[in-house]
């Protein structure tokens, strides 16, 4: 308002901006026209008002052709309050001037509060200056907090949520580090063309094909989320993808990396590099750093920056395979739940597990056996989850009336047939999930059963002497590998292992040596390792 200009029409000096405006945001509604050169015949360098503001601002006043290029805006965003202020004033002025909206899409969002839901005030001591946040949590973590927030809810901003985000990002960091570490050992150097084509020239296992499909799925989900301008959906899709990649693919493929399985290297590299491209709009600095380690410094002809690589190509994922592994993972989760309920460690082998209600997992029995550390996996056999069922009289009474006592008696006798999704068939009637009340579980001796309404997983928890011995071997292997890590040994270093009175453990000598990279096993006074 302190800037004075000369009127180009009459030559009057000292012309000032009109001070009486209703609201700065209402006044700002003219921005799509005033800053883009609407109806301006020529481009004016150095300022607005036919050059009258020259040397007061470095901005140019574009010409009308420039306005036509950029009008209407693809996207504008501000707080919800701008619906009645800036968004409205832009729309009103634009319709009056050119009979057209000045934007193609609008995103409004709610307030930012502290992590406890209170407004931020300097006098309250809960205000976080931007410079402090940049220093303590980093720009990418700040961006993640903003983008992870559904726009119709208040953002609770603070160092607590930032710490949780860093914990999640550590999984991604460790996954990239895992591949880079083994790639450096084995000299793995893919070509940049492999990123567009996917893992080619190798025979992919079903697990590899699943990760390719999972990668294609996260690209599709992220693309849809960005097109809908809902970045919290992108982050949810990416977090689920990283969990699957780390806690399923890498964990189930570790030995393949020890043995330099080219298909595993190519598949994981493709998935990680593609995933970084997906998340780069949210966390540009970390994504670019990891890209350089994973791609730019490793692939001839690769763009130096992830932002020169473009968006991943959209492909149709194998939905059937994705559904199969999703069900397998759910079975494994239920099996681990049953182990936890029974108080049996995962390193303790068990004899068998029986699964009921599975539609897609029958071809993945070996994976289930390995994940749950059992010798046998059976489907649609074994004990059934015995859960006491009662009729929901409030819902069932009006529908079946006099037949309710018969249904109640049949439920008490355990004659209900599970139909999935909480539905049951009993006494000739099919009951919906809300027509049945599920009571306490009835225990079965020697078995622990976990049930989620569709799938039932029954775990045989009896441990004989053979299972107990194998459990001790697993515990020993875990302890020795922890000792290797604590001693700072490299992944490829060989050791000499000393066992105190090896006894029956030596019957599994070859297994122990293979899992601990031991060249030989000696018997001594205490458990010890030394570099071979």
Where are the regions that the model predicts?
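Short Ser/Thr-interspersed hydrophobic loop/turn segments at strand-loop and sheet-helix junctions
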Residues: 89-96, 146
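Short, solvent-exposed cationic patches
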Residues: 135-147
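A short glycine/serine-rich beta->alpha loop
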Residues: 65-82
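Short, solvent-exposed helix-loop connector elements
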Residues: 153-161
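Feature 926 captures the class I aminoacyl-tRNA synthetase adenylation module centered on the KMSKS loop
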Residues: 1-32, 38-40, 97-136, 160-532
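Flexible glycine/proline-enriched surface loops and loop-helix/loop-strand junctions
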Residues: 69-73, 126-127, 153
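Aromatic-residue-lined binding/catalytic grooves and analogous aromatic/hydrophobic interfacial grooves
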Residues: 43, 59
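Conserved, well-structured core segments
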Residues: 85-89, 239
């Amino acid at each position: 308002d302190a800037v004075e200009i000369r009127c180009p029409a009459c030559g009057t000096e000292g012309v000032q901006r009109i001070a009486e405006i209703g609201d700065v945001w209402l006044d700002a509604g003219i921005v799509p026209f005033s800053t883009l050169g609407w109806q301006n015949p020529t481009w004016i360098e150095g300022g607005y008002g036919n050059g009258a503001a020259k040397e007061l601002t470095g901005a140019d006043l574009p010409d009308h052709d420039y306005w036509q290029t950029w009008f209407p805006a693809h996207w504008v965003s501000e707080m919800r309050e701008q619906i009645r202020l800036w968004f409205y004033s832009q729309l009103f002025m634009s319709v009056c001037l050119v009979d057209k909206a000045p934007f193609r899409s609008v995103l409004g969002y709610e307030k930012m509060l502290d992590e406890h839901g209170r407004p931020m005030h300097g006098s309250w001591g809960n205000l976080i200056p931007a410079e402090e946040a940049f220093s303590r949590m980093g720009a990418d973590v700040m961006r993640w907090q903003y983008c992870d927030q559904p726009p119709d809810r208040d953002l609770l901003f603070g160092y607590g949520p930032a710490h949780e985000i860093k914990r999640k990002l550590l999984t991604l960091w460790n996954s990239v580090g895992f591949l880079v570490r083994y790639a450096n050992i084995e000299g793995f150097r893919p070509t940049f063309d492999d990123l567009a084509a996917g893992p080619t020239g190798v025979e992919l296992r079903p697990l590899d094909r699943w990760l390719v499909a999972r990668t294609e799925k996260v690209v599709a989900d992220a693309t849809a989320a960005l097109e809908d301008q809902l970045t919290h959906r992108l982050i949810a899709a990416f977090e689920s993808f990283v969990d699957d990649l780390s806690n399923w693919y890498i964990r189930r493929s570790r030995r393949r990396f020890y043995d330099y399985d080219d298909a595993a290297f190519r598949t994981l590299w493709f998935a990680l590099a593609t995933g970084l491209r997906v998340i780069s709009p949210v966390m540009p600095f970390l994504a670019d750093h990891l890209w350089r380690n994973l791609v730019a410094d490793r692939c001839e002809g690769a763009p130096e920056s992830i932002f020169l690589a473009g968006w991943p190509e959209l492909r149709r994922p194998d939905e059937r395979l994705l559904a199969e592994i999703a069900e397998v993972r759910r079975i494994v989760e239920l099996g681990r739940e049953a182990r936890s309920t029974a108080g049996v460690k995962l390193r303790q082998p068990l004899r068998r597990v029986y699964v009921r209600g599975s539609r897609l997992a029958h071809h993945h029995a070996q994976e289930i056996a390995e994940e749950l550390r059992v010798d046998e996996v059976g489907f649609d056999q074994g004990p059934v989850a015995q859960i006491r069922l009662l009729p929901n009289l409030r819902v069932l009474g009006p529908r079946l009336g006099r037949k309710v006592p018969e249904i109640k008696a049949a439920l008490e006798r355990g004659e209900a047939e599970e139909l999935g999704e909480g539905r049951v068939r009993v006494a000739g009637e099919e009951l919906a999930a809300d027509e049945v009340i599920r009571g306490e579980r009835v225990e079965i001796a020697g078995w622990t059963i976990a049930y989620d309404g569709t799938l039932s997983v029954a775990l045989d928890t009896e441990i004989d002497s053979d299972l107990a011995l194998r459990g001790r071997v697993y515990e020993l292997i875990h302890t020795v590998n922890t000792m290797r890590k604590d001693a700072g040994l490299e992944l490829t270093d060989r050791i000499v292992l000393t066992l105190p009175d090896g006894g029956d453990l030596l019957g599994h000598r070859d297994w122990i040596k293979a899992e601990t990279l031991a060249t030989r096993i000696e018997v001594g006074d205490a458990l010890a390792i030394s570099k071979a």
